[in-house]
From Swiss-Prot:
SUPFAM superfamilies: Annexin
Lineage: Eukaryota, Metamonada, Diplomonadida, Hexamitidae, Giardiinae
Annexin repeats: from-to residues: 5-73, 75-146, 154-223, 227-295
Function comment: Giardins are involved in parasite attachment to the intestinal mucosa and in the cytoskeletal disassembly and reassembly that marks the transition from infectious trophozoite to transmissible cyst. They may interact with other cytoskeletal proteins such as microtubules in the microribbons or crossbridges, to maintain the integrity of the ventral disk.
Keyword field: Annexin, Cytoplasm, Cytoskeleton, Microtubule, Repeat
An example Gene Ontology CC term for this record: cytoplasm
Localization of this protein: Cytoplasm, Cytoskeleton
Name used for this protein in its record: Giardin subunit alpha-8
Stored InterPro entries: Alpha_giardin, Annexin_repeat, Annexin_sf
Chloroplast in keyword set: no
Gene Ontology molecular function terms on file: calcium ion binding; calcium-dependent phospholipid binding; phosphatidylserine binding
Superkingdom of the source species: Eukaryota
Gene Ontology process terms (BP): cytoskeleton organization
């Protein structure tokens, strides 16, 4: 089956699932394709039904599942741009800024800049800086991360020592400087040298040196440079802490970087089990679609277990 025909067939399957309000099938279809291909499916959907999938989900209401599907079936660069505007409109949403700015590839950031300018008639970086003075280390991290200006430092041992000094002295500015200028390939080597010398993980050292929000921002940046899936796992774990959980964070990460973070279910093992944490934190109406999207567990087994418990 050629690519365009396949998109039409998938669009029909998605439409049938939406008409039947079959959340499991919708989630399975959504998670099967990368975001770029979902856009092709959405176009085929529009040609056949004269409406976009996201618009049909909007008619369902404003629940967690609907919100997640709306984001997943919207162009991810457009979605990121709109969420960034929400994050700086009114009270600053620092959690959203970490999710949206730190967990973003260079190519995705360039596309987001274009969409932001198109929708809001102002440059994204300028708008963020107007609304967020860099008066805290985590804000400076966001500010400088937006430049995506990295280079090879070519001195791993020296940089590992600088990192050690910055952490021992609680020097947030120095931590920011090395995080925002180092290429991912070299960051891994610097971290390995640091951890070999100190015999403790960098995350542990960051948590000891920075008890405030810098802890979250610095750890997210550190993990994104090492492996995007580790950053997703770290923040999803944070989102699953507490009684209610932070669905907005989980929704942002799932809809924007799922394709780039499919190792998340494996690296999450340092915190526990991804599927179990989703089910512990959210109702099954929300947790099961999330588990399906992240391919964290066999959905058929979950449904069978639920059926056995009922009977």
């Amino acid at each position: 089956m050629d690519d365009s025909r396949k998109a039409y067939v998938v669009a029909q399957d998605l439409h049938n699932a939406i008409m039947q309000r079959d959340a499991i099938t919708i989630s399975e279809i959504t998670g099967r394709y990368v975001s770029g291909y979902r856009e092709k499916i959405a176009l085929a959907f529009m040609e056949q039904y004269n409406v976009l999938p996201a618009d049909l989900f909007k008619e369902w209401g404003t629940g967690y599942f609907e919100s997640l599907m709306i984001r997943c079936w919207t162009n991810r660069h457009e979605a990121r741009a709109k969420m960034l505007k929400e994050a700086i409109r009114g009270a600053l949403d620092r959690d959203a800024l970490v999710d949206l700015v730190i967990l973003c590839s260079t190519d995705d950031w360039a596309s987001t800049l274009v969409h932001y300018q198109k929708h809001f008639r102002i440059a994204l970086k300028a708008d963020i800086r107007l609304n967020m003075p860099a008066d805290r280390p985590w804000k400076a991290l966001i500010d400088r991360w937006m430049e995506h200006d990295r280079h090879y430092r070519n001195n791993v041992k020296t940089d590992a020592h600088m990192l050690l000094q910055a952490l021992e002295g609680g020097n947030g500015a120095a931590i920011v400087d090395i995080l925002v200028t180092t290429k991912p390939q070299e960051w891994e080597k610097i971290v390995a040298a640091y951890e070999e010398h100190t015999n403790k993980s960098l995350e542990t050292a960051i948590c000891m040196a920075f008890p405030g929000f810098e802890q979250t921002a610095f750890c997210a940046a550190h993990y994104w440079l090492c492996e995007p899936s580790k950053a997703a796992a770290f923040l999803i774990h944070r989102a699953c802490e507490g009684k209610r959980g932070d669905f907005r964070r989980v929704c942002r990460i799932t809809s924007l970087v799922l394709d780039q973070c499919l190792k998340c279910k494996y690296v999450y093992s340092v915190y526990g089990h991804l599927a179990a944490d989703f089910r512990k934190t959210f109702s099954d109406n929300t947790a099961i679609p999330l588990i399906s999207l992240w391919r964290a567990y066999d959905i058929g087994k979950i449904l069978a277990e639920k059926h056995e418990n009922i009977t």
